[in-house]
C-alpha cells in the first residue's frame, strides 16, 4: 500500500505517502503542485475518486486550487464561484460556442484567475453593496479588451453592465445604426436620433446619446460605486471600432 501509485479519474498520478489503520491514507498528487490529500480512504484511492483541487475540472481550464474559498455554501454554489465559472464558460465552453460567439476563442481568462482561489480573493476584496446584483465587466476600463484579469476588470451593478452589452447582429453595422438608401439612421434606447448621409455622422450622434446616458446613470450610482468604477464610467469613450458587429468596408 505505502508508495503505491495510481491515476485518479482525471488522469493525475497520485501516490500513497502515509498509511494508518482501517485504510486511512495520505495521498500526494504527482503534478506541479504536489497537493497532499490527508485522511483519504484506500478504497477511494483504488477507484480513482480522490479529487485533486488542481485538476482542471471547469471547462478543462479552471481549477479550485488550495485555499480558504469554497465553491459551495448552504447547499448551493457561492456568488463568486458562479461568476468565475461564468467567465470561463464564455471563453472556453465549446458546446455553447454559438451562444457565446463574441467570447469563445476571442476572449481569455488570465492564468491567475484560472485558479478559483485567486479570483475569489479578488472578488471579496472588491465587492460592495449596491442596488441590484454585481456583474464583472472587462471592457469599461479598457474598451475592446479581451482579457479577464484583475488589472482589466471591474465589478459593476447589473444596470450599469447592461449599458455596455454588445448584442450581436448580422448587418455588419454597429449597434444603433440602420442602413437606408439615403444614408444611415441612428437609434438609441428606442428613440430615433435622425438620418445622416454617412455612417460616421450617424455613429457620432449615437455615441453622444449613449455617453450622456452613461454619465447620467454613473451619477445616479455615484454614492454606491467605488471611485475607480465611477471614474472609468466618466472616462469611457463610445468608439465604433469597439463594436463587435462593425465590419470595416
Language-model features: locations:
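A short, exposed loop/beta-hairpin motif centered on an aromatic-Gly-Thr core
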Residues: 105-110, 190-200
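Extended, polar beta-sheet/loop recognition surfaces of beta-rich domains
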Residues: 41-59, 64, 160, 168, ...
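Short helix-coil boundary/hinge micro-motifs
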Residues: 1-36, 51-84, 106-109
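Secondary-structure transition/turn motif
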Residues: 28-33, 158, 187-191
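Short, cationic Gly/His-enriched loop motifs
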Residues: 68-93, 98-183
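An aromatic-rich alpha-helical recognition segment common to small helix-rich domains
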Residues: 27, 119, 177, 186, ...
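GIY-YIG-like beta-to-alpha core
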Residues: 28-45, 79-89, 195-201
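Class I S-adenosyl-L-methionine
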Residues: 87, 205-208, 212, 219-220
Amino acid at each position: 500500500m505505502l508508495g503505491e501509485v495510481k491515476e485518479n479519474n482525471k488522469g493525475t498520478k497520485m501516490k500513497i505517502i502515509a498509511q494508518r489503520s482501517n485504510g486511512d491514507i495520505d495521498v500526494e498528487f504527482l503534478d506541479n503542485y504536489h497537493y497532499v490529500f490527508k485522511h483519504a480512504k484506500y478504497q477511494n484511492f483504488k477507484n480513482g475518486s480522490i479529487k485533486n483541487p488542481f485538476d482542471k475540472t471547469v471547462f478543462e481550464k479552471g481549477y479550485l486550487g488550495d485555499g480558504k474559498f469554497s465553491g459551495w455554501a448552504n447547499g448551493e454554489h457561492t456568488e463568486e464561484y458562479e461568476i468565475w465559472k461564468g467567465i470561463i464558460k464564455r471563453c472556453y465552453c465549446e458546446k455553447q460556442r454559438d451562444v457565446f460567439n463574441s467570447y469563445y476563442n476571442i476572449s481569455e481568462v488570465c492564468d491567475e484567475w484560472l485558479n478559483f482561489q485567486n479570483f475569489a480573493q479578488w472578488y471579496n476584496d472588491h465587492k460592495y453593496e449596491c442596488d441590484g446584483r454585481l456583474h464583472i465587466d472587462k471592457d469599461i476600463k479598457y474598451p475592446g479588451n479581451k482579457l479577464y484579469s484583475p488589472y482589466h476588470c471591474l465589478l459593476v451593478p447589473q444596470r450599469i453592465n447592461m449599458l455596455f452589452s454588445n448584442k450581436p447582429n448580422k448587418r455588419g453595422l454597429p449597434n444603433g445604426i440602420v442602413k437606408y438608401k439615403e444614408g444611415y439612421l441612428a437609434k438609441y434606447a428606442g428613440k430615433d436620433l435622425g438620418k445622416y448621409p454617412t455612417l460616421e455622422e450617424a455613429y457620432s450622434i449615437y455615441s453622444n446619446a449613449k455617453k450622456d446616458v452613461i454619465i447620467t446613470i454613473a451619477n445616479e450610482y455615484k454614492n454606491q460605486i467605488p471611485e475607480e468604477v465611477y471614474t472609468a464610467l466618466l472616462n469611457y469613450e463610445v468608439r465604433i471600432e469597439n463594436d463587435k458587429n462593425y465590419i470595416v468596408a
